[in-house]
Amino acid sequence: MSKAHGSRPYRRHNVVIPRQQPEKEMNFVQQQPPPSDAAARQMMYPPNCQVGVQDPVYLAKEFNLLTLNPQQLEGSRHQQMAKGPEKSLYSQYEQKVRPCIDLVDSLRALGVEQDLALPAIAVIGDQSSGKSSVLEALSGVALPRGSGIVTRCPLVLKLKRDPHKAWRGRISYRKTELQFQDPSQVEKEIRQAQNIIAGQGLGISHELISLEITSPEVPDLTLIDLPGITRVAVGNQPQDIGVQIKALIKNYIQKQETINLVVVPCNVDIATTEALSMAQEVDPNGDRTIGVLTKPDLVDRGTEKTVVNVAQNLTYHLQKGYMIVRCRGQEEITNQLSLAEATEKERMFFQTHPYFRALLEEGKATVPCLAERLTKELILHINKSLPLLEKQIRESHQRATDELHQCGDSIPSNEADKMFFLIEKIKLFNQDIDKLIEGEEIVKKNETRLYNKIREEFEHWALVLTANTQKVKNIVSEEVSVYEKQYRGKELLGFVNYKTFETIVHQYIEQLVEPALTMLRKTIEIVWQAFTDTAKKHFSVFSNLSQTIQNKIEDIKTRQAETAENLIRLQFRMEQLVYCQDQIYSVVLRKVRKEVFNPAGKAAQDLQLKFPFPKDLPSMSSNDEIGVHLNAYFLETSKRLANQIPFIIQYFVLQENGSCLQKAMMQILQEREQYSWLLQEHADTSAKRRFLKEKIYRLAQARRALYMFFS
């Protein structure tokens, strides 16, 4: 044991980067500039993938390379002593560690985490929990320390073990990247980065700082250090600093892809720690939570058994359990105790402690054991997450591509190209208007074609005509009696007073005018909405062009509506003439008379009237005769109006309206000096297009990285 924990405490627990991993390719992916429009379309798909063809699944064939379960990993330690490193199971595991972590790190560097959650280990803890000491012990470098909030931005700590190279570090944030060879520079550079990002005060920021450390002494591991939890604002801190920090932490730990590393001091009641409460809130079963107990040397005498119970998962159960570590105290830091010496001192502490020795024997104590455990957990977590991640990247890439398609192409700068661009836009718009007019437009599920909406109005018009004729049937006897008493002259019984008939016809024809105009107005609105929606679909990103077209739609609608209304009113004025061809009217009249004289026969059809007559009279009264004529005339008039009014509306409101709009669109092309003005985009549209192109680019690179990893 002592030999394993010498001056290079992690060497036994860490791995060699396999030379065959595509590190150069990963770097190449990260260094490429965002592509042009044409290049972006090419980069949206991995090699050998075709647009429109179902995406290949890259994971199934090679994914078993990572399927090492925890028992295999644990057992590999003992096998390593008996077998050569190349043949041991643990050696196989080592060959997979660095590529897996590098893959996720490269995806994070590409910015994929803006779109999707990546597998990660997030480190959280209350202030003064010993979180910084744990990270220092793992990384081998001094991190910002002090009272109050020292971690003010999320810090991505990438640890890479390379036994063949000297220590080197790299810090990157925003557009800054610094490299250094002295570990003592780390604390200063982190503080400077935090001041630039979060300001000189005590505020915090969600913006990431990335610190990469390559050394023979560090484990292969990536952690995300989050600000320590505070309850009360101190000094110049914002009053809601506690709320801000909790919101930042929750943003990370609530993701299912995140393992939560909760740092808790041994000398406090574990049930009262805010960090563990937050972890339990987002992970009630503790499936994603690992507890790290710190400061075991500060526990009160007599409470050691309580600490052991916690470490053995008997007090506050977590599915992944607990680890316990002893890091450098403030006095040891002041005395410049090296991390290697601290590791040896830690080992001796646990080895000689009467209570905590058992935890060391169980592999639950010391920083080196923690490092090995975290590396193992991260690899298994990546293994578990990659299939879903590949699917999410593919689906997100497709959604972004579809959104970019809806935004349309970028506007050309050349005037001639602008003309062709506008011609194409107008051509596509006119084609869609044609489809609306012909009833051939493509509709989504639960949507209705324009023609069907108009047809519903026409069907309602037929019902109005039926109701009007039924009204005549219901009151004709009463009204004819009134007219006969007022207007009958010297005619004998049975002679029809034509004036009475004509007056009733005029009255009930007039009642149809307003329903016909109502149908016209509703149809106008239906067509206007369809044309407007089509214009928005094609031109919504161009505010000036969109407004110009909307004005044309309104103007043409008004003209066609006025023409249609005038023709409808003219039609009803003509209906006041009371006319029907003799040949047609005689047939209808004969049919009605037959039904009247045969009341026990076939039931009358729609728009037909039937009147009772005394069976002992061979002829009808004048009232009855007028009723028969009204029935016959309204039968024929209703047929005429049922077709004629919809004809007028359909022709002027749909056909002529659409045709005039298409011609007006072509006239826009004559205004060449207006092209630049017409094609001005909304500011947010160009920003959205730029954002989507960048998103598609990084997701395409992520897909390429996954493809290269599994190929």
UniProtKB/Swiss-Prot annotation:
Induction summary: By type I and type III interferons.
Q: Where in the cell is it found?
A: Cytoplasm; Nucleus
The question of whether Ribonucleoprotein is a record keyword is answered with no
The region called G4 motif is annotated at 294-297
Q: Which SMART domains match?
A: DYNc, GED
Ranges for region G5 motif: 326-329
Q: Which GO terms describe its molecular function?
A: GTP binding; GTPase activity; microtubule binding
Residue intervals of the GED domain: 623-711
One GO term (biological process): defense response to virus
Q: Where is this region: G1 motif?
A: 125-132
What PROSITE patterns does UniProt report for this protein, alphabetically?
Answer: G_DYNAMIN_1, G_DYNAMIN_2, GED
Q: Provide the residue span(s) of the region labelled G3 motif.
A: 225-228
GO cellular component terms given for this protein? cytoplasm; exocytic vesicle; microtubule; nucleus; plasma membrane; presynapse; synapse
Keyword Ubl conjugation assigned to the entry: answer is no
Q: Where is the Dynamin-type G domain?
A: 115-387
Write the record's keywords in alphabetical order, separated by commas: Antiviral defense, Cytoplasm, GTP-binding, Immunity, Innate immunity, Nucleotide-binding, Nucleus
Q: What positions does the entry give for GTP binding? A: 125-132, 225-229, 294-297
- Chain positions covered by the region annotation G2 motif: 150-152
**Which coarse location class describes where this protein primarily resides?**
cytoplasm
Pfam hit, one? Dynamin_N
Gene3D superfamilies named in the record: Dynamin, middle domain, P-loop containing nucleotide triphosphate hydrolases
The family line of this record is: Belongs to the TRAFAC class dynamin-like GTPase superfamily. Dynamin/Fzo/YdjA family.
Give the function comment from the record. Answer: Interferon-induced dynamin-like GTPase with antiviral activity against vesicular stomatitis virus (VSV).
Q: What is this protein called?
A: Interferon-induced GTP-binding protein Mx2
- Species name: Canis lupus familiaris (Dog)
What's the name of its gene? MX2
